[in-house]
């Protein structure tokens, strides 16, 4: 044994009693390591390879044990590039799973999968660390109440409400407003619920991660002057990282969120962008470990891996983690095993529509395609349910009439249908809303609309009280009183 005492990563201190093995085989990001008899590390233990490559450069690679092969060998997956590693190099067993910093010190900072800051703002002053592999809360700790998580965004709260401690799938292509919607949710949970957010960038583009960070600084979600006032911690494992890092970065983000829920007893928003990349990384690792692939080439452990992550995202009696997960659907095939497995865990879906974005209606949430298991009369109440159904029926009828309008024009419709179209166009515009985080771009101040105000506004449109108002009065306003005031101003101008 080497007499060595150094500190590595977030929380692993290596001492005299080190358990040291040697690399016996390297296949890409997978290492086989031989340990002395009776000194085998456990599954999920963190191993550290330190040394120098042939060019004399320092090497520091963290790996995670995935398989015990027999003959005193383990197979581990590297969390960073394995360039420069050689057979025969010493590998130190840390004796514990990978641990990452948690707590207030993480807010406003960017971390990698190992919990190391990557934003050039110096070390993180975190006194507490948690292992990334933790069991889900016990059944007795779970909160069984079905309660709505109010976001202050009209279209979401009315038509596809989020469940407190639930999981929401966010569907949308490039450039339809996913990032702005995510930032508005982060802003609103901080202001209305006193909560914090954790953003896990899993296997997405580095450019997008950088853009998100810059936009968060611009909209003051991350406060550069006083970093402790920031509302979000960012954890990135992007496309260029090895599959081991992409597979575990979701767990790192979740572990940071669990601290705020379990210790600080807060409501937390956890964003995962993109949950499909988590599955994809698991599939790569599974193939590298030599497992027989399952349907469509995915890993045989797909459901287990997804379940292990998703079951930790829940409400307890102390606090909640509400998760919003961007879902990439490969080749738009909803029956593909990756999205199909994800759907089994979702409580609501928010679908962003390019058609609405093209009309300038933001947030471009599709009111007919977005769904929620919470939209039941015994959960949200009769009034909310009836209003939501009325809005959906009106919009659906308008959608059916659009072909006739395109060919024959509005004048050929019956009086009743013309009224439906007029109300639907008002509803469509009233579903738009100015965002706090977009103030910089739009110039109009953001609005948080309570659920009661939202229901009242749509009831007034459906009942015909506001039929005389011009439809532009409903565009990009908060509650219905603002629409009334805007209508009065428009009439004055005319």
Swiss-Prot record:
Belongs to the ATPase alpha/beta chains family. It is found in: Plastid, Chloroplast thylakoid membrane. It is a peripheral membrane protein. Keywords: ATP synthesis, ATP-binding, CF(1), Chloroplast, Hydrogen ion transport, Ion transport, Membrane, Nucleotide-binding, Plastid, Thylakoid, Translocase, Transport. This is ATP synthase subunit beta, chloroplastic. Its EC number is 7.1.2.2. Produces ATP from ADP in the presence of a proton gradient across the membrane. The catalytic sites are hosted primarily by the beta subunits. GO terms for molecular function: ATP binding; ATP hydrolysis activity; proton-transporting ATP synthase activity, rotational mechanism. GO terms for biological process: proton motive force-driven mitochondrial ATP synthesis. Gene3D superfamilies: 2.40.10.170, Bovine Mitochondrial F1-atpase, Atp Synthase Beta Chain, Chain D, domain 3, P-loop containing nucleotide triphosphate hydrolases. The lineage of its organism: Eukaryota, Viridiplantae, Streptophyta, Embryophyta, Bryophyta.
């Amino acid at each position: 044994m080497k007499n060595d005492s150094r500190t590595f990563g977030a929380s692993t201190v290596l001492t005299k009693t080190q358990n040291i093995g040697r690399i016996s085989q390297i296949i890409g990001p997978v290492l086989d390591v031989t340990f002395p008899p009776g000194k085998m590390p456990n599954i999920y233990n963190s191993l550290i390879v330190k040394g120098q490559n042939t060019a004399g450069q320092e090497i520091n690679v963290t790996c995670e044990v995935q398989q015990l092969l027999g003959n005193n060998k383990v197979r581990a997956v590297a969390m960073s590039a394995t360039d420069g590693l050689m057979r025969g190099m010493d590998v130190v067993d840390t004796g514990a799973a990978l641990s990452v910093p948690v707590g207030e010190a993480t807010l406003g900072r960017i971390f990698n999968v190992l919990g190391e800051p990557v934003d050039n703002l110096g070390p993180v002053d975190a006194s507490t660390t948690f292992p990334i592999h933790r069991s889900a809360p016990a059944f007795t700790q779970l909160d069984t109440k079905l309660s709505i998580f109010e976001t202050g965004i009209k279209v979401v709260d009315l038509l596809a409400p989020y469940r407190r401690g639930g999981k929401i799938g966010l569907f949308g292509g490039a450039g339809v407003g996913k990032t702005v919607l995510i930032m508005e949710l982060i802003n609103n949970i901080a202001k209305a619920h006193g909560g914090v957010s954790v953003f896990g960038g899993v296997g997405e583009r580095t450019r997008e991660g950088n853009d998100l960070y810059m936009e968060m600084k611009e909209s003051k979600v991350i406060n550069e002057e006083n970093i402790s006032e920031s509302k979000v911690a960012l954890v990135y494992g992007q496309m260029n990282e090895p599959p081991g890092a992409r597979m575990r970065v979701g767990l790192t983000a979740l572990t940071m969120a669990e601290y705020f829920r379990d210790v600080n007893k807060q409501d937390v928003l956890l964003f995962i962008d993109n949950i499909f990349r988590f599955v994809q990384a698991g599939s790569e690792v599974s193939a590298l470990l030599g497992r027989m692939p399952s349907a469509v080439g995915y890993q045989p452990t797909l459901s287990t891996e997804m379940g292990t992550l998703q079951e930790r995202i829940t409400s307890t009696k102390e606090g909640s983690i509400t998760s919003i997960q961007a879902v990439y659907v490969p080749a738009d095939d909803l029956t593909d095993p990756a999205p199909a497995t994800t759907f089994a865990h979702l409580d609501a879906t928010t679908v962003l529509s390019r058609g609405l974005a093209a009309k300038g209606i933001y947030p471009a949430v599709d009111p007919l395609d977005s769904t929620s298991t919470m939209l039941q009369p015994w959960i949200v109440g009769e009034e909310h349910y009836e209003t939501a159904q009325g809005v959906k029926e009106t919009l659906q009828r308008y959608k059916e009439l659009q072909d006739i309008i395109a060919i024959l024009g509005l004048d050929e419709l019956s009086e009743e249908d013309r009224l439906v179209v007029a109300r639907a166009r008002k509803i469509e515009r009233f579903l738009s809303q100015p965002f706090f985080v977009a103030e910089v771009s739009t110039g109009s101040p953001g609005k948080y609309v309570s659920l009661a105000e939202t229901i009242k506004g749509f009831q007034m449109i459906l009942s015909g009280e506001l039929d005389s108002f011009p439809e532009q009065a409903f565009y990009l306003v908060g509650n219905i009183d603002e629409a009334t005031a805007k209508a009065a101003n428009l009439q004055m101008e005319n």
